[in-house]
Amino acid sequence: MSELTPESFEHIPWQAPWRYVRIGEGTGYESDLAAEVGKGHPLHEARAIAVGVRVDQDDVLFLIPDAPKPLAVVHFTRASAAEGNSKFPHTTFYSSLDDWLRRGMVADHAHYLKGDAPENEDE
């Protein structure tokens, strides 16, 4: 499989409630991530690039270029990293784009169409 880059996400078949975050559009999400993750969180000081956003919730898909699991969906809580809970914001990691498409976007799309709330799975 080729290396994931932000451009890798431009032409995937996005399904509601997810949408693509254009290059340069994600800096606000990246700032939010830096403000919310504290020491002990797996994404603390990680290089993270926002590539997708869930429009009906506070979920953002980040590309983590140098990580073994290069994709992470972060559910923002609007809490400060200073609050010190390394379990928040809730984060689900994915091993590949195919993994996120199957377990993330496709599952979220099915819940969205049914009007179901998504299930939070810790990973």
PLM region descriptions:
Residues 22-24, 50, 82, 113:
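Intrinsically disordered, low-complexity segments enriched in small/polar residues
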Residues 3-19, 57, 61, 68-88:
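Charged interaction scaffolds used for protein-protein
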Residues 71-118:
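Helix-rich interaction surfaces within compact, conserved domain-sized segments
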Residues 1-11, 105-123:
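Intrinsically disordered, low-complexity regulatory segments
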Residues 35-68:
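Amphipathic, interaction-prone secondary-structure segments
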Residues 13, 37-41, 52, 101, ...:
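Generic secondary-structure transition motif, activating predominantly at the C-termini of alpha-helices
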Residues 2-47:
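Negatively charged, low-complexity tracts enriched in Asp/Glu with abundant Ser/Thr
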